[in-house]
């Protein structure tokens, strides 16, 4: 089953990063395309910490599975819309994961597989839960996560400058450190948020 989980993680992360790159391309920035990142090749998107270490750490500690991939290169000088354009690029990835979770849930619901005990239902629920984990984790407003891109767009200049210094100084290591320090609180947040969204999905199909 670990192979299935890794395959779901990998596929979800690739589509997440493709969404970033495609929205950036639509807003005038061809950097991701020029560097070959608008690709389904997983090796172009893998990051050893966020793509491998964090998901495996969460899996083996029994926490909700989440992670990320190597950030798609963005040239903000080419991007239309300024900070709001960057916010759109940032939110595109998590929204893709949310939509993947919703589509997988709807397929599982209307085929009935998520209510059975067979392997198909298990795989569908992995797709749902992993993508919801990616969605929730990546919308956290912590640099350099995607949620911080939205915060950049609405934050006062002073707050934005502090965020930029944090991102330049610590990068993804800040996120990794927070996961280690606040693992219990983060797991609780992720589980509660995931359950809340699943309840929303059930309500959408009239099963709640």
Question: What are these regions, as identified by a protein language model?
Answer:
Residues 1-208:
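Hydrophobic transmembrane alpha-helices and their immediate loop junctions
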